[in-house]
Amino acid sequence: MMEMRNVKGTKDYLPEEQVLRNKIKRACEDTFERYGCKPLETPTLNMYELMSYKYGGGDEILKEIYTLQDQGKRELALRYDLTIPFAKVVAMNPNLRLPFKRYEIGKVFRDGPIKQGRFREFIQCDVDIVGVESVMAEAELMAMAFELFRTLNLEITIQYNNRKLLNGILESINIPTELTSDVILSLDKIEKIGIDGVRKDVLERGISEEMADTICNTVLSCLKLTIADFKEAFNNPLVADGVNELQQLQQYLIALGINENTIFNPFLARGLTMYTGTVYEIFLKDRSITSSIGSGGRYDNIIGAFRGDNMNYPTVGISFGLDVIYTALSQKETISSTADVFIIPLGTELQCLQIAQQLRSTTSLKVELELAGRKLKRALNYANKENIPYVLIIGEDELSTNTVVLRNMKEGSEVKVPISSLSRYL
């Protein structure tokens, strides 16, 4: 007999789990649409050439791409994010009206390490805006993140930076261009591995000891600086551009009333090579999950590269991990039922079928009907285990008086109510 098991890094979600996951998805959709975003769906299966493009995830992500061949021997890949497919859609549809704000919620795949809230098949919830140069777009996406997590009763902080600032700092201390990406990947891990860990990491990447010392000394001096201080500390045009954008973003965050819940982090990099400006990561305030639960940033070069005109198409996005949000919520929240009311017929199946259908047609109630013919005690036990708040018990006596027995499962109380006014009691 075949051994039944899931592929490592994948998971089945049973109904009591999926109820909460659907709640998160609906909260995302509702919030995204409140900000004027339009829905989009892209294929899970893509050409490998697209997913491995140099302006995409960079060398690190190439190791995690799931690849396959079709019967025509074409090299294909499962998408590892929703950003590159979105950029492809914009590049293929030059008549899209800009600015274009889209959201997509879908499965992505990465053959990477597995940890709490992180799987190899997972769902991302993305919003991207193309056609806006102003960092007002970043501010709006950050405000949207706070609204989404407020809806889900989760408190967050957002760390942010600007890649122009970071690239300018490295340029000003004479880090060679070909080593910049390696240094950025090391600096991006500073909160996890500390300054000594950064030194060790850059040395392992082939950086000289002298250069490693320069990097570490620069990091230590930068940690004491405010955003405005960087202009004086580093006489570099990229640093100046980064500071200007960061100061403008900060003004918008103050105007939106969210600045106090954000943190400027000069070494936040979002390792991916595609980012050109603002970058940010979202964390739970209580750190019940230590990894980020959302992230994003500005990437102005990808669409132009795909279209072959190498023009800038100003684009900024944000992405939330549904699975890691689910992990956070499942630690705090009692799983709610899929039904509001459960109807138990006692020899009155036909009439109960009609009553259930009438309630579904005339109210917004979610109604489940006892179909298995269980005795009253077993049916009530089922409703209790499923956290269904109300039960209707309908026998011949009730039908003869046009009433039903309404049982409040939380309180354990019962009352007879007229069928005609049933919806008022639920």
From Swiss-Prot:
Catalytic activity reported: tRNA(His) + L-histidine + ATP = L-histidyl-tRNA(His) + AMP + diphosphate + H(+)
Entry similarity comment: Belongs to the class-II aminoacyl-tRNA synthetase family.
GO cellular component term of the entry, any: cytoplasm
Cellular compartment(s): Cytoplasm
Gene that this polypeptide is encoded by: hisS-1
A Pfam family recorded for this sequence: tRNA-synt_His
E.C. number: 6.1.1.21
Biological-process GO terms, alphabetical: histidyl-tRNA aminoacylation
Organism: Bacillus cereus (strain ATCC 14579 / DSM 31 / CCUG 7414 / JCM 2152 / NBRC 15305 / NCIMB 9373 / NCTC 2599 / NRRL B-3711)
CDD domains from the UniProt entry: HisRS-like_core, HisRS_anticodon
Protein name per UniProt: Histidine--tRNA ligase 1
Source species, domain of life: Bacteria
PANTHER family, sorted: HISTIDINE--TRNA LIGASE (PTHR11476:SF7), HISTIDYL-TRNA SYNTHETASE (PTHR11476)
GO-annotated molecular function: ATP binding; catalytic activity, acting on a protein; histidine-tRNA ligase activity; transferase activity
Keyword annotations: Aminoacyl-tRNA synthetase, ATP-binding, Cytoplasm, Ligase, Nucleotide-binding, Protein biosynthesis
First-listed, main subcellular location of the protein, grouped into a coarse class: cytoplasm
SUPFAM superfamilies to which the protein is assigned, alphabetical: Class II aaRS ABD-related, Class II aaRS and biotin synthetases
Subunit structure: Homodimer.
HAMAP family to which the protein is assigned, alphabetical: His_tRNA_synth
